[in-house]
Amino acid sequence: MSDSQTLVVKLGTSVLTGGSRRLNRAHIVELVRQCAQLHAAGHRIVIVTSGAIAAGREHLGYPELPATIASKQLLAAVGQSRLIQLWEQLFSIYGIHIGQMLLTRADMEDRERFLNARDTLRALLDNHIVPVINENDAVATAEIKVGDNDNLSALAAILAGADKLLLLTDQQGLFTADPRSNPQAELIKDVYGVDDALRSIAGDSVSGLGTGGMSTKLQAADVACRAGIDTIIASGSKPGVIGDVMEGISVGTRFHAQASPLENRKRWIFGAPPAGEITVDEGATAAMLERGSSLLPKGIKSVTGNFSRGEVIRICNLQGRDIAHGVSRYNSDALRRIAGHHSQQIDAILGYEYGPVAVHRDDMITR
């Protein structure tokens, strides 16, 4: 249909469990019903699901396990199959097929893998199949994890070319303060840009079952909106919430998409989880933010992490604030060696060069 839209729905652990230790199947049935109704109307639906660890813990009878990464991955390995079976069973009631996609950060960092994931996701949608996406928690290490399903959902929205991203949670939306401890807190209904003031009031969820809080939802909204995707944070327990969002009814907190969205390559740069981090001096900060300049080695103060040439890195100012993301022209070891030096010295220091800049302005997104 001509007015068909693509919606990515992220379902957090607190929504799927209702705050308990087990999946709330009755509630999941209702969420699937809403999605199926939209699917029947010609809309394209993508599910980003949490809950694998909770499903694994329930299936194994809530075993007492040490609080280690291995234990979580054990539970995820058991729970992931149970979770996907549940989604398949419920969507099949409406004659809808699903397709599972397990992603890691590596799928987003590498441009070719990013494009492959995009093509797979869009092929599923083109064939009226509902993609069900989760991070591959059973094998992902800290180095290759996106980290939380909020940011994963923003990346999925970019991959899908979505019109809207809906982050369902156990809160009504983003408030001026934590409503659990401050009765004067007010719901923020509309946001037209994520800034430091907004970041400072985004407290973390008290749910012990998931990995994302309100701060990660804010990060996801920022990424999606700058890619031209409206983002809504709303309560997963609100009746008819998914349909309301598609109809444009005001629910929760709406983050309005940037009027001039990033072009495709820069969407990838902005959305890709950084492989490392560099800190730059005040001169470099001003040059990038005020004049749109490339980053020269001279302005680099320190390099954190190990990354390859061509990977996306985070650029921070001296106060530790994330000011830009960009594709590094040099690997981390090379950047450490040329940091603080003039560009004319690169060849003498390294014995080779890939140009005078560390990060070119055409491969950079300022925040």
Curated annotation (Swiss-Prot):
Listed GO MF terms: ATP binding; glutamate 5-kinase activity; RNA binding
UniProt keyword annotation of Transferase present: yes
Highest taxon of source: Bacteria
Protein name, entry field: Glutamate 5-kinase
Catalytic activity, as annotated: L-glutamate + ATP = L-glutamyl 5-phosphate + ADP
Organism: Salmonella typhimurium (strain LT2 / SGSC1412 / ATCC 700720)
The family this protein is said to belong to: Belongs to the glutamate 5-kinase family.
Recorded GO CC terms: cytosol
